[in-house]
């Protein structure tokens, strides 16, 4: 994994932003997550360098840790939030309200009131009833919020596990009905100011992403003409993927930027004041995180080797429930050749608790420290943190040779 070597390996040793493994596993109890601030900044700058005309909104759902949010806020990112608690986290981390977009398919009156009181850049509507609720709340608060209409487009579906367009969906207005449906509620306080389209997650296909960006640009202009709303913001969603298996290639961000340069330039020439947004979570933070757990016992059973660790699906559930094989390393033995095929398991009393099946590792022994890579997104908060009362893993952030609890 190229990013792992780039961000975490120095002279054959596991090091996060200058802090060696011994300084982590010796000082803090395993299991824990460690995040590299340098890695987060690097991924943000890469995206911003190739798409300078876009505001990059960090999707807090990927990792709402305040320290992670702070790194991205100070780097210049905005925020995309999906709950009142995420909104509060973003504001506490220092994100300006004008840099925040609120995206959630089930909004209550209390949710909408909190969002409108905060004065975010935009709130996304998924249905005509959403528009009615936003309008009623705006009237009661005497505010004039900016609304983005989310659209379930008719575009071709990409090859991805989580696809949110092209078929029936709980998300957004169906493209073929959006003009009629959005015209239903009479809006006197809220105003439709643009569109949002989030098509899929974890997309590595550059050609499809280029087609998606062009599709959304055309659709935004078409709807603006047909409905008469002033196009102030176009939110393209996210979906930028990362390598999740050893065989995966990285997303060619430079090639993607080159592929959409002409349609973007034409759009900007027509609408130079229109704000363009990308939402990005996994792409920015996943590769910046490693889940660290310690081997308690090694067992061989009927031809299989099991490394039974102090952290499993209770602390890192994603590999189990999403069936994703996060690359594994013995962090204290990076310079040794892999000679064994190992099932890395946790302490939970279920056979489901295997966080890395058939991992190719040096033959493990008790006391070894296992790292699961690309664990910076959908790790801690997606896990079964109170299952079997095992205790919660720590979160640590390393930044320029300083390690602290995040």
Where are these regions (language model features)?
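Conserved, mostly hydrophobic/aromatic
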Residues: 40, 61, 83, 115, ...
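Structured core elements
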Residues: 78-80, 101, 124, 148-150, ...
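Charged (often Lys/Glu-rich) extended helix/loop segments that serve as interaction or gating elements
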Residues: 259, 273-406
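Short, glycine-/Ser/Thr-/acidic-enriched flexible segments
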Residues: 39, 63, 86, 107, ...
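A charged N-terminal "starter" segment
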Residues: 1-145, 187, 191, 225, ...
């Amino acid at each position: 994994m190229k990013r792992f070597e780039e961000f975490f390996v120095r002279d054959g040793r596991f090091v996060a932003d200058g802090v060696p493994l011994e300084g982590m596993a010796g000082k803090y109890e395993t299991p824990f997550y460690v995040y590299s601030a340098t890695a987060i900044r690097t991924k943000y700058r890469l995206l911003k360098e190739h798409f300078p005309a876009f505001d990059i909104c960090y999707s807090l759902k990927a990792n709402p840790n305040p320290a992670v949010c702070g790194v991205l806020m100070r780097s210049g990112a905005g925020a995309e939030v999906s709950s009142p608690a995420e909104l509060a986290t973003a504001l506490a981390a220092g994100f300006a309200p004008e840099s925040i977009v609120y995206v959630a398919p089930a909004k209550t009156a209390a949710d909408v009131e909190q969002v409108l009181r905060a004065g975010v850049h935009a709130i996304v509507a998924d249905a005509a009833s959403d528009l009615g609720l936003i309008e009623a709340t705006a009237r009661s608060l005497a505010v004039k919020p900016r609304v983005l209409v989310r659209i379930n487009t008719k575009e071709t579906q990409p090859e991805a596990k989580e696809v949110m367009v092209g078929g029936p969906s709980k998300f957004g207005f169906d493209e073929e009905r959006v003009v009629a449906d959005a015209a239903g509620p009479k809006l006197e306080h809220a105003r439709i100011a643009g569109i949002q389209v989030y098509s899929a997650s974890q997309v590595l296909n550059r050609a499809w992403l280029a087609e998606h960006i062009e599709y959304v640009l055309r659709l935004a202009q078409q709807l603006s003409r047909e409905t008469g709303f002033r196009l102030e913001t176009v939110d393209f969603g996210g979906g930028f993927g990362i390598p999740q298996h050893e065989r995966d290639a990285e997303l060619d961000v430079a090639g993607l930027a080159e592929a959409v340069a002409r349609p973007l330039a034409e759009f900007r020439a027509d609408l130079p004041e229109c704000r363009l947004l990308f939402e990005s979570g996994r792409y920015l933070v996943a590769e910046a995180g490693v889940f660290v757990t310690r081997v308690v016992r090694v067992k061989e059973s009927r031809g299989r080797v099991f490394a039974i660790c102090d952290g499993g699906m209770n602390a890192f559930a994603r590999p189990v429930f999403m069936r994703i094989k996060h690359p594994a390393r013995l962090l204290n033995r990076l310079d040794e050749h892999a000679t064994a095929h190992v099932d890395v398991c946790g302490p939970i009393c279920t056979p489901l608790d295997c966080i890395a099946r058939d991992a190719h590792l040096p033959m493990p022994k008790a006391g070894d420290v296992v790292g699961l890579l690309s664990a910076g997104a959908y790790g801690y908060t997606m896990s079964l943190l109170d299952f079997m009362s095992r205790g919660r893993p720590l979160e640590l952030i390393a930044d320029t040779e300083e390690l602290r609890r995040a």
